[in-house]
């Protein structure tokens, strides 16, 4: 009788690991397929809704609403083209972008540097908390004239105001992230003989990092707002100044064009920061704390 040779499954292949591995692999493939389909649907839906909005806006301008109030997409595009051809967009945009980036970075670093030791020393945080609460209760826009009086009319007050808009959001979330570390985890790590430095890098930092990154992702618009508010108050350059000049000329298209450019800058910078969130997918989703200090 001739022996029947059965196929030998390769080590590590789905066949060698049993039916459960095949089912798991199929489920992963279906999940990826659904994810790609959802992303395509979202992209198409967003583009379609944007196109519909622009069409309705264009049709409503001059027929339902006076162009003075809402302008029109074609007029906004014409204003943008004029700024690009004259070089105004790049000239003013670079100052706003510089103030936004410097304010964002300096405000975030200052917030983390101050919040980190206070988060570790709860008694010190409770002592200083009222002072941060008082500073946080002051409307950030109201600090614009103060910073201009202190630092003059150059780039510095715009950077400081942008940093002020960023500081408290990052500060509150950093302190929250540090204080959310489970006490039991700290005790177990100490019992195992971990040094203070090891405790900081292996337990506290990984637990607080999602809170910090969540704050960093949402404070970019705040930094842009701070820089533009400073340009609105007193400046002869920047997108805030360019938009204010358009408003002084009663150019609705110019005002909307300035808003579009600022939104595009913030959106681009936010997309550049998105990989920071993907790097911590294993962490639980964290909501940014915008509440009191």
Where are these regions (language model features)?
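Short cytoplasmic-facing helical segments at TM-TM junctions of multi-pass membrane proteins
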Residues: 130, 173-218, 239, 243
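Generic hydrophobic transmembrane alpha-helix motif, especially the helices
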Residues: 133-169, 176-177
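Periplasmic/extracellular loop-to-transmembrane helix junction in inner-membrane transport proteins
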Residues: 30-38, 62-106
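C-terminal transmembrane helix and the adjacent membrane-cytosol boundary/short C-terminal tail
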Residues: 122, 210, 256-293
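N-terminal signal-anchor/first transmembrane alpha helix
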Residues: 30-61
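Alpha-helical membrane-protein architecture signal
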Residues: 77, 86, 90, 94, ...
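Transmembrane-helix boundary motif in ABC transporter permease subunits
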Residues: 102-132
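Transmembrane alpha-helices
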Residues: 160, 164, 196-230, 257, ...
């Amino acid at each position: 009788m001739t022996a029947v040779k059965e196929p030998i499954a390769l080590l590590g292949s789905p066949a060698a690991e049993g039916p459960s591995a095949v089912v798991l692999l199929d489920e992963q493939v279906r999940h990826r397929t659904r994810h790609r389909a959802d992303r395509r649907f979202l992209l198409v839906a967003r583009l379609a809704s944007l196109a519909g909005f622009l069409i309705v806006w264009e049709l409503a301008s001059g027929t339902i609403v006076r162009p003075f109030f809402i302008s029109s997409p074609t007029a906004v595009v014409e204003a943008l083209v004029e700024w690009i051809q004259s070089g105004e967009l790049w000239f003013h945009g670079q100052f706003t972008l510089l103030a936004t980036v410097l304010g964002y970075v300096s405000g975030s670093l200052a917030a983390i540097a101050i919040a980190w030791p206070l988060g570790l020393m709860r008694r010190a945080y409770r002592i200083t908390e009222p002072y941060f609460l008082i500073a946080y209760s002051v409307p950030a826009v109201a600090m614009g004239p103060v910073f201009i009086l202190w630092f003059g009319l150059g780039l510095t007050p715009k950077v400081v105001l942008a940093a002020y808009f960023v500081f408290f959001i990052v500060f509150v979330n950093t302190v929250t992230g540090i204080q959310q570390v489970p006490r039991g985890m700290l005790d177990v790590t100490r019992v195992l003989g971990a040094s203070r430095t090891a405790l900081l890098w292996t337990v506290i930092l990984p637990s607080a990092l999602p809170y910090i990154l969540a704050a960093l992702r949402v404070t970019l618009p705040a930094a842009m707002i701070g820089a533009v508010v400073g340009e609105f108050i007193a400046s002869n350059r920047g997108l805030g100044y360019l938009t204010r000049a358009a408003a002084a000329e009663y150019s609705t298209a110019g005002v909307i064009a300035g808003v579009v450019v600022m939104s595009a800058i913030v959106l681009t910078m936010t997309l550049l920061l998105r990989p920071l969130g993907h790097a911590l997918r294993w962490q639980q989703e964290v909501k940014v704390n915008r509440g009191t200090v």
